């Protein structure tokens, strides 16, 4: 790799204030034999900001943007919720993503799943994520895992993740995921959707939020199988999950801890429900 001081001098010469345009980042990659991620790392260390993140800066500082770039987030489920979550995390500049899903795209996904199209039918969802992120933000590293999450493999699948995002479509899998996150001490941002409705909650290690939320679940398919899933509900709930994820990564604001944000898009009503409203154990 080229001498970092020489690279920094090139970047400083071509910066617009403290912003560096994509064309100059590409030229630095070509001239000095850098990967996109290597170039972006040097840009941040030089006190500069890639211009793609310019509109983030009124919300977060350059130092916080660099922190996002150094963060790893695992997303379990790459369909309706997960596709939007992964796209938004990549656009926000989270530098390391793990995309976990055993399935491939089918025709019934076309109405709502961001990464599904006639050209991706039959393509593994996790692999489609890697391709899409490579197009949207090539500096982001994606590890696609074409497999189901199982708690026995939690160490391998979630290693190094600062946050895990639950974008699953079954209660059983969701409870297994929360157990794996608890074991590893990783915060979990959980979301689910059904028809016009959805919820988001954030579970920190030691909390039993999902166990209480599903205390009366008796097995079988979730309510989404009855109410269906349109295009807009996953987009709305996924955006809330990404906001929660960024807050946890950067220690900003007030997370949805020990409460559930219930979203009703039919009546345009949003309610924050404390966990005290739910049973304390499964019965």
Describe the function of each predicted region.
Residues 85-86, 129, 177:
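Hydrophobic residues within alpha-helices
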Residues 252-263:
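Core catalytic loop region at the nicotinamide-binding pocket of NAD(P)H-dependent oxidoreductases
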Residues 1-73:
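N-terminal charged helix/coil linker that caps or initiates catalytic domains
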Residues 95, 141, 187:
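Residue-level detector of anion-binding/catalytic polar loops
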Residues 2-24, 144, 149-150, 155, ...:
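E1/E1-like adenylate-forming module used to activate ubiquitin-like modifiers
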Residues 40-41, 100-137:
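Glycine-rich phosphate-binding loop and adjoining beta1-alpha1-beta2 segment
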Residues 64-101:
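Glycine-rich adenosine-cofactor-binding loop
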């Amino acid at each position: 790799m080229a001498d970092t001081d020489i690279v920094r001098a090139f970047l400083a010469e071509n910066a617009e204030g403290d912003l560096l345009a994509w064309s100059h980042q590409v030229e630095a990659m070509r001239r000095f034999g850098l990967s996109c991620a290597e170039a972006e790392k040097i840009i941040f260390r030089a006190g500069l900001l890639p211009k793609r993140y310019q509109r983030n800066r009124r919300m977060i500082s350059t130092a916080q943007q660099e922190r996002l770039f150094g963060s790893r987030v695992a997303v379990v489920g790459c369909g309706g919720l997960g596709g939007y979550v992964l796209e938004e995390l990549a656009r926000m500049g989270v530098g390391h993503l793990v995309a976990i899903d055993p399935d491939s795209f089918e025709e019934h996904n076309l109405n709502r799943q961001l990464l599904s199209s006639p050209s991706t039918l039959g393509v593994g969802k996790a692999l489609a994520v890697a391709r899409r992120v490579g197009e949207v933000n090539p500096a982001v590293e994606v590890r696609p895992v074409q497999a189901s999450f199982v708690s026995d493999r939690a160490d391998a699948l979630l290693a190094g993740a600062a946050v895990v995002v639950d974008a699953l479509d079954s209660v059983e899998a969701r409870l297994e995921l929360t157990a794996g996150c608890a074991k590893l001490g990783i915060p979990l941002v959980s979301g689910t959707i059904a028809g016009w409705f959805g919820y988001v909650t954030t579970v920190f290690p030691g909390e039993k939020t999902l166990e209480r939320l599903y205390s009366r679940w008796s097995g079988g398919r979730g309510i989404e199988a009855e109410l269906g899933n349109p295009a807009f509900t996953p987009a709305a709930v996924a955006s809330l999950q990404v906001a929660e994820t960024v807050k946890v990564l950067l220690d900003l604001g007030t997370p949805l801890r020990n409460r559930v944000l219930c979203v009703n898009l039919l009546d345009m009503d949003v309610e924050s429900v404390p966990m005290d409203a739910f049973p304390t154990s499964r019965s």
